């Protein structure tokens, strides 16, 4: 919000999550698809005020596990499968569906593909307004990923083979060169969850990659900061945060990306719970991104899976998806990959067991597809306003109905990271634990991303009351709809957030 002494401030409220079947028609809808009576309970519409700041930037929604050329079609017990080669028409249909669901970047498939497949899907990505990330390729008998990671073993020495810069650039050209000028070519999916001992290698490859493909993305996704220290590549506990800061210092990419899947089943109670370090990972990676102004990207949970003794549950409701995305938006995130999109095998090479996500193991859309579609449509509907702001900090508010007196996710944050007050907010109260992400645009307007942080499995609504200093009106984006509303005389706005829901207030 801009700071005015004698005039009002226009506020923009943006609820970022659509529901299945929402078509943007007038009327506000709750998680059941019915009108929400609290949407304009204490305000009336006006055409006198507005917030008009906008950008052309697009929120990035990426697939993880893309469309294959040969799809494994499993039997009902998932004990066997046959291979189905997808026709050009079937490939076209899948890309059309991904585009319609709001995906902006398609990743490569689970298993390696050849260049012929990527020629087809690059054209399809362009046709439907998307970008295509290329995955593993083997050309002239040499794996691109293995070469770039230093994993090819010299048969004569038994040690990793060494390649000159020119040899690496030549293989990059051989594998990806024909795609470099394609309008849909996004980059190369390089390394998932490396430890810090690999950073020098990644830095070298990024430099060479940019010499061959300037401006394209060499994609690296990092581990949760809370995993075992040895997995991060350090031995001293005091060095844990260096996993992120060393990446920023050594590797010149325009983003930092990580994963932390938050929804799990408690082994003792059987209850669906939230990982207490979900927000802490956001904090650490947000702080790293802010060192030099990088994009903050993450992976979120669309597929239930069982691995390393933890059962990550399948998101069941629209609230599960809204809650994940809205929490990330409260920390100023700008890109999300869904883990997973097209179904991986039932069990992977290290024993992790997978359910399915937006597509099942017969290649059919699931209910998850429609929930993700709804969420992504709503984010795209207000992204031009959201990206007009820069993230500054976050407030954590304990809800009035919190009976234990603390929220594990909030207490996990470093002391002093979350702020307690903001000059624009005179008073606030929340029924449930609530996040308030604080933003500011180039003209001095303040923005707030307010999220119902209650466990979506508990299905609790969050009655939020905010009193703003020096403000008379709000412009509201909710479910692909914009309304401009007058505040109460004292600057108060009241709203009931559905489970997992969020609003953006300018």
Walk through the language-model features, giving the residues of each:
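Glycan-processing catalytic domains of CAZymes
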Residues: 33-473, 477-506
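Bacterial signal peptide processing site
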Residues: 23-26
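Bacterial N-terminal signal peptides that target proteins for export
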Residues: 1-11
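C-terminal motif of bacterial Sec signal peptides marking the signal peptidase cleavage site
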Residues: 18-21
């Amino acid at each position: 919000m801009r700071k005015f002494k004698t005039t009002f401030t226009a506020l923009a409220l943006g609820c970022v999550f659509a529901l299945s079947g929402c078509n943007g028609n007038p009327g506000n809808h709750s998680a059941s698809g019915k009108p929400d009576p609290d949407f304009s309970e204490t305000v009336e519409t006006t055409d006198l005020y507005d917030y008009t700041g906008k950008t052309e930037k697009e929120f990035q929604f990426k697939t993880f596990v893309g469309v294959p050329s040969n799809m494994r079609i499993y039997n009902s017990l998932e004990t066997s499968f046959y291979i189905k080669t997808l026709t050009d028409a079937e490939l076209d249909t899948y890309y059309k569906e991904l585009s319609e669901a709001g995906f902006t970047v398609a990743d490569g498939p689970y298993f390696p593909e050849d260049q012929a497949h990527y020629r087809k899907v690059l054209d399809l990505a362009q046709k439907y307004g998307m970008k295509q990330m290329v995955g593993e390729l083997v050309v002239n008998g040499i794996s691109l990923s293995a070469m770039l990671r230093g994993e090819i073993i010299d048969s004569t020495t038994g040690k990793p083979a060494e390649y000159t810069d020119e040899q690496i650039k030549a293989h990059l050209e051989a594998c990806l060169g024909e795609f470099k000028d394609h309008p849909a070519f996004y980059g190369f999916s390089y390394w998932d969850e490396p430890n810090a001992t690999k950073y020098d290698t990644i830095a070298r490859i990024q430099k060479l990659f940019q010499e061959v493909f300037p401006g394209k993305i060499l994609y690296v996704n990092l581990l949760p900061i809370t995993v075992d220290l040895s997995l991060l590549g350090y031995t001293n506990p005091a060095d844990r945060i260096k996993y992120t800061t060393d990446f920023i210092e050594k590797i010149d990419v325009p983003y930092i990306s990580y994963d932390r899947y938050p929804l799990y089943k408690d082994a003792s109670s059987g209850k669906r719970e939230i990982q207490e370090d979900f927000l802490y990972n956001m904090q650490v990676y947000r702080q790293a991104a802010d060192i030099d102004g990088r994009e903050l990207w993450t992976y979120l949970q669309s597929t239930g899976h069982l691995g390393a003794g933890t059962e990550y549950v399948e998101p069941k409701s629209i609230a599960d998806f809204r809650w994940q995305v809205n929490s990330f938006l409260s920390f100023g995130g700008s890109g999300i990959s869904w883990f997973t999109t097209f179904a991986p095998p039932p069990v992977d090479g290290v024993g992790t067991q997978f359910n399915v996500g937006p597509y099942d193991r017969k290649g059919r859309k699931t209910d998850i597809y429609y929930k993700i579609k709804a969420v992504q449509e709503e984010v795209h509907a207000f992204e031009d306003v959201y990206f007009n702001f820069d993230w500054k900090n976050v407030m954590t508010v304990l809800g009035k109905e919190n009976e234990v007196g603390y929220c594990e996710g909030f207490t996990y944050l470093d002391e002093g990271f979350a702020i307690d007050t903001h000059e624009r907010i005179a008073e606030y109260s929340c029924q449930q634990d609530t996040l308030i992400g604080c933003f500011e645009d180039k003209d001095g307007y303040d923005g707030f991303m307010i999220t119902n942080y209650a466990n979506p499995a508990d299905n609790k609504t969050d009655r939020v009351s905010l009193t703003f200093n020096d403000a008379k009106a709000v412009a509201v984006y909710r479910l692909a709809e914009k309304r401009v509303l007058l505040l109460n005389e004292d600057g108060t706005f009241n709203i009931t957030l559905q489970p997992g829901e969020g609003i953006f207030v300018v």
